[in-house]
C-alpha cells in the first residue's frame, strides 16, 4: 500500500474513532440526564441507598425476592423507589389507596417489561392497550358469561377426579408428593376442554407434558431477563444461551397451541358443525375467535388469533395451578381449618360423586380459606403501569408522566398497615360482613383490566379444593418447605411438596 493510501486509511480510522467517541459521549450524556430526571421525579419516594450502576438489583438476587420486598413494605409507607440499575427505576406501590387511584386510570402496561413476553404469547389481551384492548375485551367477555361457566363445573370435576385417581395410586407407594406438576396438567386439561373444545385428556397426552415444561422454562427465563441489564437488548438476548433456550421453549408452546387451533378448525369444517355453533346462544372462547376470523375477515388476523390462544392457554391454566397448589399447601399447614372445610364439604356433597354450579355458593368457610390463601399467596404477585400523565396520590405525593409503577399485589396482601399480622393464616378476615378496603384484596388485579377469567378460576379452585379434601388428608413435608418466588406467577423454587393420606 502506498504512503498516500496509508495516510488516507489512517485519516478515515481517526474520523471513525472520533465519531464513535462522540456517539458514546452523547449516549452517556443522555443516560446522565435521564438519571437526573429520575432522581428528581422520585425524590418524594425514599428508598434504601442504591449503587449508581446496579441500583438495588443485588438486593433481589437472593434465593427469594420476597423477604427484601416485605422489609420495604414495613419501612416505607405506601410506596418506595426501586432502582433496577443506574438508569432504570420504578415506584413500588403496596397501599390500597394508591392502588385505587392508579387502577381507576387507563395508563398502559409498562412496555419495557411486558414487551419481553411478546415472543412467547404475542400481543393478546394481556399485552394490548388502548382501543384495541377495549375492543378485544368486549369481544371475549361473553365467553365468561355465567351460562357458559355453569356446565364447565362438571368438566372441571372430571379433570380433578382424573388427577386424584393418579394421586391415590402414587400415595399407596409413597405418601410424599410434589403437587405443582400434576395440578398444572389438571388445569391445562380443564382449560382445553372448557375454552378450546378439546376432546382428549391433557393429563395423559405426552405433548401436554412438553408444553407444561416449556411454560416453566419460559417463566424462569422471563424472570432472569427482567433482572439483567445486559439481556434487555434483543440482539444480545437472541445470541445468548438464555435467548436460544427461550426460542426453543416458545416454539414448543406455539406448536401446542397451533395443534389446538387446527383441530378445532377441522371440527368446525365438518358438515353441519359450523351451523350448530352459530345457533348457540353463547360461544366458548376459541369459537368466538374462530368465528370472528371467518366472518369478519381482517378484523382478526391469524397472528391475533394465535396470540389470544397463547395468552389464554397460559393464563387459563398456570395462574390457576399456582392458586390451587398454594391453597392446598396453606390448608395442609393448618389442619384445623382443613378439617373444618372438609366437614363443610361432606355436609354439602356427601360421598362427593357430583358437584354442581349451585354447590359453589354453599361452601362459605371453604371460600374464606381459599381467599385467605390467595391473600398470602397471590397467583399474580404484581402488575405494572407506565404513567401516561402526571398523578397525585391521596397523601399529596405526585409523579410525572413517564414513570413506571410496579403495583405489588404480594406487598399489598402482606402490608401490616392493611392486614394486621399479615403472615398469619386467618380465614375470619373474609367472614361475611367483615369490612376491608375495596382495593386491599386483589388476587385477580383490579380496575377495568382485572382478570377476565376470575370467576372461571375461582370456580375451578373451589371444585379442586372440595374434591381433594373429600379424598385426602393433607400435611406439609417439613423437609421440603416451598420457597416462594415471583416469575410472572407466584411459583416455588423447589416445588410444593405435601404428604397425603387417603381417607377411608
Swiss-Prot record:
It is a multi-pass membrane protein. Its EC number is 1.14.14.80. The keyword DNA repair does not apply. GO terms for biological process: lipid metabolic process. It catalyses: an omega-methyl-long-chain fatty acid + reduced [NADPH--hemoprotein reductase] + O2 = an omega-hydroxy-long-chain fatty acid + oxidized [NADPH--hemoprotein reductase] + H2O + H(+). SUPFAM superfamilies: Cytochrome P450. Its main location: endoplasmic reticulum. Heme binds at residue 451. It is an enzyme of class 1 (oxidoreductase). Gene3D superfamilies: Cytochrome P450 (1.10.630.10). InterPro entries: Cyt_P450, Cyt_P450_CS, Cyt_P450_E_grp-I, Cyt_P450_sf, Cytochrome_P450_Monoox. Keywords: Endoplasmic reticulum, Heme, Iron, Membrane, Metal-binding, Monooxygenase, NADP, Oxidoreductase, Transmembrane, Transmembrane helix. GO terms for cellular component: endoplasmic reticulum membrane. It holds the Pfam family p450. GO terms for molecular function: heme binding; iron ion binding; long-chain fatty acid omega-hydroxylase activity. It is found in: Endoplasmic reticulum membrane. Its cofactor is heme. It comes from the Eukaryota. The chain crosses the membrane at residues 6-26, 112-132. Belongs to the cytochrome P450 family. Catalyzes the omega- and (omega-1)-hydroxylation of various fatty acids such as laurate and palmitate. Has no activity toward taurochenodeoxycholic acid. This is Cytochrome P450 4A24. It comes from Sus scrofa.
Amino acid at each position: 500500500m502506498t504512503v498516500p493510501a496509508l495516510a488516507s486509511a489512517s485519516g478515515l480510522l481517526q474520523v471513525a474513532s472520533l465519531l464513535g467517541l462522540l456517539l458514546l459521549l452523547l449516549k452517556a450524556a443522555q443516560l446522565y440526564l435521564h438519571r437526573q430526571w429520575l432522581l428528581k421525579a422520585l425524590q418524594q419516594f425514599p428508598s434504601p441507598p442504591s449503587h449508581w450502576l446496579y441500583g438495588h438489583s443485588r438486593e433481589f438476587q437472593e434465593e427469594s425476592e420476597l423477604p427484601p420486598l416485605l422489609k420495604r413494605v414495613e419501612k416505607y409507607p405506601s410506596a418506595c423507589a426501586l432502582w433496577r440499575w443506574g438508569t432504570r427505576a420504578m415506584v413500588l406501590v403496596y397501599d390500597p389507596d394508591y392502588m385505587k387511584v392508579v387502577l381507576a386510570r387507563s395508563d398502559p402496561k409498562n412496555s419495557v417489561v411486558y414487551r419481553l413476553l411478546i415472543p412467547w404469547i404475542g400481543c393478546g389481551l394481556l399485552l394490548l392497550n388502548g382501543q384495541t384492548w377495549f375492543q378485544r375485551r368486549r369481544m371475549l367477555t361473553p365467553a365468561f358469561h355465567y351460562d357458559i361457566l355453569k356446565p364447565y363445573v362438571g368438566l372441571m370435576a372430571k379433570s380433578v377426579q382424573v388427577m386424584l385417581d393418579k394421586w391415590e395410586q402414587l400415595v399407596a407407594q409413597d405418601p410424599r408428593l410434589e403437587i405443582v406438576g400434576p395440578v398444572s396438567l389438571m388445569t391445562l386439561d380443564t382449560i382445553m376442554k372448557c375454552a378450546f373444545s378439546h376432546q382428549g385428556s391433557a393429563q395423559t397426552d405426552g405433548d401436554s407434558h412438553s408444553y407444561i415444561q416449556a411454560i416453566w422454562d419460559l417463566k424462569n427465563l422471563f424472570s432472569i431477563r427482567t433482572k439483567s441489564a445486559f439481556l434487555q437488548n434483543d440482539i444480545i438476548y437472541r445470541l445468548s444461551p438464555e435467548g436460544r433456550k427461550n426460542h426453543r421453549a416458545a416454539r414448543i408452546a406455539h406448536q401446542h397451541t397451533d395443534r389446538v387451533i387446527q383441530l378445532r378448525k377441522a371440527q368446525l369444517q365438518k358438515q353441519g358443525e359450523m351451523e350448530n355453533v352459530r345457533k348457540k346462544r353463547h360461544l366458548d372462547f376459541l369459537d368466538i375467535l374462530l368465528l370472528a376470523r371467518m366472518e369478519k375477515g381482517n378484523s382478526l388476523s391469524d397472528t391475533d388469533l394465535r396470540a389470544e390462544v397463547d395468552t389464554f392457554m397460559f393464563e387459563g391454566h398456570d395462574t390457576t395451578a399456582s392458586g390451587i397448589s398454594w391453597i392446598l399447601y396453606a390448608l395442609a399447614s393448618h389442619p384445623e381449618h382443613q378439617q373444618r372445610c372438609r366437614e363443610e364439604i361432606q355436609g354439602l356433597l356427601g360421598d362427593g360423586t357430583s358437584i354442581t354450579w349451585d354447590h359453589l355458593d354453599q361452601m362459605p368457610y371453604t371460600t374464606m380459606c381459599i381467599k385467605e390463601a390467595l391473600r398470602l399467596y397471590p397467583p399474580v404477585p404484581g402488575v405494572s403501569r407506565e404513567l401516561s400523565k402526571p398523578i397525585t396520590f391521596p397523601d399529596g405525593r405526585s409523579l410525572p408522566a413517564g414513570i413506571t409503577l410496579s403495583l405489588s399485589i404480594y406487598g399489598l396482601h402482606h402490608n401490616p398497615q392493611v392486614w394486621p399480622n399479615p403472615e398469619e393464616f386467618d380465614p375470619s378476615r373474609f367472614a361475611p360482613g367483615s369490612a376491608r378496603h375495596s382495593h386491599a384484596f386483589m388476587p385477580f388485579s383490579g380496575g377495568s383490566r382485572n382478570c377476565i377469567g376470575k370467576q372461571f378460576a375461582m370456580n375451578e379452585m373451589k371444585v379442586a379444593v372440595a374434591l381433594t379434601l373429600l379424598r385426602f388428608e393433607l400435611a406439609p413435608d417439613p423437609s421440603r418447605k416451598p420457597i416462594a418466588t415471583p416469575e410472572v406467577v407466584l411459583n416455588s423454587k423447589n416445588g410444593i411438596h405435601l404428604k397425603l393420606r387417603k381417607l377411608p
